[in-house]
Amino acid sequence: MIELNQVVKRYHTKDKDVLAVDNVNLNIETGSIFGVIGFSGAGKSTLIRMFNNLEEPTSGDIIIDGDNINKLSKAELRRKRQKVSMVFQHFNLLWSRTVLRNITFPLEIAGYSKTKANERAKELIDLVGLNGRENAYPSELSGGQKQRVGIARALANEPDVLLCDEATSALDPQTTDEILDLLLKIKERENLTIVIITHEMHVIRRVCDEVAVMESGRVIEQGKVTQVFENPQHEVTRRFVKDDLDDDFEESIKHLEPLDSDAYIVRLNFNGGNTTEPVVSYISKTHNIDINILEANIKNTRGGSVGFLVVHIPHIAETEFETFKEDLHQQHVNVEVVKHG
């Protein structure tokens, strides 16, 4: 379990004080993948660097498996950092060392014998899919391969927690998905708790169980990934969800304007099992109404499928529309009126 209680990080400059992290409270379950998303400057990277005390909090407590990180002695902190490891955006590899030697580096520092360090490194090279590249140097690797080395190095000391600070943001979409699949594989095999910092909702949707959304140093929304996708509460969250779902239906409805007085354009939000059910067909027949589908999308999360339909109902009485909405709610479909004539 990771607990953050009223965590604050304030920087002092000669011109002004900067409040980078503002009273953040989080609980992260052991064995889960927890995502923190926000735009640049939201405070998310500062936050994650306080998990292993690369940044000291100005105030508040960060407790990992019962240890208050900012109250450990230097010796205790060094030992704890072996169990709270980190993967960086720009790999941070040692360019004069081979793949094998980059991975053995933290083991050498920890006092492993050369034989033991090599055994562990070769095991990790196999795990991250770099067999045959152990003697290559970083300059000979692709971006995805470099990040695989970074992940293997982070796993060298068998950590309990893996921190990923924008670990895929320097990668192309295909390589990003390959790295995310690798993290899922590692999480299951090593029984890790993973905390991911990102500005990409695609990353959150693909691998995370829960997400916290940050803006201006504060957590503005938090919950299960499926819940946040189904019903985002904050404007920033809605922007992230809209971008990931390619939800840009405004162009699709322009040709329908102006609407007749008894016409509606509605967005139907689906989740879980009802994404595969013939809900629209059922509703159309039950209420004897025409429904035109303007736009649709379904995406998968670790907690189930989420998706939406934007539909045009050319003619429906107001009282009938209320019944229509209630029927959809009974089938766990959220109805949002986009426009009404």
From Swiss-Prot:
Named from the GO MF annotations, one term is: ABC-type D-methionine transporter activity
Q: Which reaction does it catalyse?
A: L-methionine(out) + ATP + H2O = L-methionine(in) + ADP + phosphate + H(+); D-methionine(out) + ATP + H2O = D-methionine(in) + ADP + phosphate + H(+)
Nucleotide-binding as a keyword of this entry, yes or no, is yes
Q: Which SMART domains match?
A: AAA, NIL
Which residues take part in binding ATP? G38, F39, S40, G41, A42, G43, K44, S45
Q: What is its main location?
A: membrane
Which terms in the GO cellular component ontology are assigned?
plasma membrane
Q: Report the membrane topology from the UniProt record.
A: Peripheral membrane protein
Keywords linked to the UniProt accession: Amino-acid transport, ATP-binding, Cell membrane, Membrane, Nucleotide-binding, Translocase, Transport
**Where does the source fall among the domains of life?**
Bacteria
Do you know which CDD domains this protein is assigned to? ABC_MetN_methionine_transporter
Taken from the record, one Pfam family name reads NIL
Asked if the keyword Transport belongs to this entry, the reply reads yes
EC number(s) of the enzyme? 7.4.2.11
Residue ranges of domain ABC transporter in the record: 2-241
Localization, UniProt: Cell membrane
Per its database record, what is this protein's job? Part of the ABC transporter complex MetNIQ involved in methionine import. Responsible for energy coupling to the transport system.
Q: Tell me the protein family, please.
A: Belongs to the ABC transporter superfamily. Methionine importer (TC 3.A.1.24) family.
Relate the assembly described in the record.
The complex is composed of two ATP-binding proteins (MetN), two transmembrane proteins (MetI) and a solute-binding protein (MetQ).
Name this protein carries in UniProt: Methionine import ATP-binding protein MetN
Q: Which organism is it from?
A: Staphylococcus haemolyticus (strain JCSC1435)
Its lineage opens with:
Bacteria, Bacillati, Bacillota, Bacilli, Bacillales
